[in-house]
Amino acid sequence: MKIQIGTNAGNVWKALSNGKLEIKALKKAVKLTEKDLYAALGWLAREEKIFFEENDAEIFVGLI
């Protein structure tokens, strides 16, 4: 499980390398389930690699 989360975190990192994305767009780009996406985001957040930004009702994620 830990290895899969790390792999998914790498895929999220690659998707965010071109700039911040809204959560729904990120999920579509990396083709992960909601559970797997949030696990990968948690991994990257704990490592202080990403930031979250709320605009209106949408949440964006980007690389630090």
Give each language-model segment a name.
Residues K2-A9, G19-E22, E54-I64:
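Short, cationic-aromatic polyanion-contact patches
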